[in-house]
Curated annotation (Swiss-Prot):
It comes from Drosophila melanogaster (Fruit fly). This is M-phase inducer phosphatase. The modification Phosphoserine is found at residue 455. Pfam families: Rhodanese. One of its GO terms (molecular function) is protein tyrosine phosphatase activity. SUPFAM superfamilies: Rhodanese/Cell cycle control phosphatase (SSF52821).
Length: 479
């Protein structure tokens, strides 16, 4: 009985529990259904709320509800580059007693990244265009000055009127150097110059065209060119001074004007029917000539020199100088009467081609009239030293008178044929002293070497390899 009673009690309790569980489950189901209905109502009433990305909307605190994006289906699927985020912020209502029943419909403002980027770029482009328009308008109203210049200038820009030039004619100096195409009329023009343009500024640096006039000869062009150069070197006259037209200077004498005279002189010198002409091709030689070993030099015999010393040519020769080119120890051993010892080129320069000597020679040539002033060179045999000094004087004299060719300071130069050796053998009475000392005299071997080296150094020959040349000259002189 006891066990039956216990079983019945357990069954009752189980029935109660089952009933209780059934009632509880039904109540739970009812509660879950009510909650689902409430959520559906909340979703239906979500149109009254405003969801935004920005912080510019306000919602009353009593209406704040939590809505998950998962429920709204606003999130993109996994892996999509477009992701949305809903931000809801409280909205502060204005403090007004009566609120309007009709409120504007609230909607969602959802933008993706691409649309937001495009809108931002378009807004920035609009702002830049507005800035460019404002800058262009400010440049147009800035009186032609570059942009930004107004920020550098603090004061007001003032323009001073140009000073009026004094009354009267004024000369305008050309902006570039005078050339062939510019004439005197262009210089003295008083008209206002035209405004400079890029074309004119570029043309002023070009070479001007030569004058196209058929009457303008090359000589006239040179004349205008010389006048232009002289005007540039002269100081500019004052504006109030009277303008005077300067005439071009006469042409200077040049070598081209004497071409006819030179050609006629050369023709006369080459003509065998006429006598030999002196260096300036003006007249014939005063002394009789003979054939010598040097065809470029005019040689005379010992007999002619003796006659000159005796005065037989006094009607033709105003003065003469005999230059002995031997070494001093030879000259002291015996020389021609009145001869002068010059054996280096430096001595020739000092004797003949200084400024004082050339001026004195020109004066003597002018005073002598038709008579001549002659020079005679010689050495021991007139084979090396005498001809060398004679050529040196003629060449340097020709160089000094290049601008006055064929004029010369010493146009008449002679060479004594066979030198002092032959003259001493035939006219010993005209020698001082009556002796003859050779260059290779054994007693003066040291003096020979000394003066030989000295003459070569003065003449610029140098001392290198002098031994072979000395042996060659000695063997030639001993023949």
């Amino acid at each position: 009985m006891l066990w039956e009673t216990i079983v019945e009690e357990n069954n009752c309790s189980m029935d109660c529990n089952i009933s209780n569980n059934t009632s509880s489950s039904s109540s739970i189901n009812k509660m879950s259904g009510s909650r689902r209905a409430r959520r559906s109502l909340e979703l239906m009433s979500m149109d009254q709320e405003e969801l935004s990305f920005y912080d510019d909307d306000v919602v009353p605190q009593d209406q704040q509800r939590s809505a998950s994006p998962e429920l709204m289906g606003l999130l993109s699927p996994e892996g999509s580059p477009q992701r949305f985020q809903i931000v809801r912020q409280p909205k502060i209502l204005p403090a007004m007693g009566v609120s309007s029943d009709h409120t504007p419909a609230r909607s969602f403002r959802i933008f993706n990244s691409l649309s937001s980027t495009c809108s931002m770029e378009s807004s920035m482009d609009d702002e830049y265009m507005e800035l460019f328009e404002m800058e262009s308008q400010s440049q147009q109203t800035a009186l032609g000055f570059p942009s930004g210049l107004n920020s550098l200038i603090s004061g007001q820009i003032k323009e001073q009127p140009a000073a009026k030039s004094p009354a009267g004619l004024s000369m305008r100096r050309p902006s570039v150097r005078r050339c062939l195409s510019m004439t005197e009329s262009n210089t003295n023009s008083t008209t206002t110059p035209p405004p400079k343009t890029p074309e004119t500024a570029r043309d002023c640096f070009k070479r001007p065209e030569p004058p196209a006039s058929a009457n303008c000869s090359p000589i006239q062009s040179k004349r205008h060119r010389c006048a232009a150069v002289e005007k540039e070197n002269c100081p500019a006259p004052s504006p109030l001074s009277q303008v005077t037209i300067s005439h071009p200077p006469p042409l200077r004498k040049c070598m081209s004007l004497n071409d006819a005279e030179i050609m006629s002189a050369l023709a006369r010198s080459e003509n065998r029917n006429e006598p030999e002409l002196i260096g300036d091709f003006s007249k014939a030689y005063a002394l009789p000539l003979m054939e010598g070993r040097h065809r470029d030099l005019k040689s005379i015999s010992s007999e002619t020199v003796a006659r000159l010393l005796k005065g037989e040519f006094s009607d033709k020769v105003a003065s003469y100088r005999i230059i002995d080119c031997r070494y001093p120890y030879e000259f002291e051993g015996g020389h021609i009467e009145g001869a002068k010892n010059l054996y280096t080129t430096e001595q020739i320069l000092d004797e003949f081609l200084t400024v004082q000597q050339t001026e004195l020679q020109q004066q003597q040539n002018a005073e002598s009239g038709h008579k001549r002033n002659i020079i005679i060179f010689h050495c021991e045999f007139s084979s090396e030293r005498g001809p060398k000094m004679s050529r040196f004087l003629r060449n340097l004299d020709r160089e000094r008178n290049t601008n006055a060719y064929p004029a010369l300071h010493y146009p008449e130069i002679y060479l004594l044929h066979n030198g002092y050796k032959e003259f001493f053998e035939s006219h010993v009475e005209l020698c001082e002293p009556h002796a003859y000392r050779t260059m290779l005299d054994p007693a003066y071997n040291e003096a020979y070497r000394h003066f030989r080296a000295k003459s070569k150094s003065w003449n610029g020959d140098g001392l290198g390899g002098a031994t072979g040349r000395l042996k060659k000259s000695r063997s030639r002189l001993m023949l």
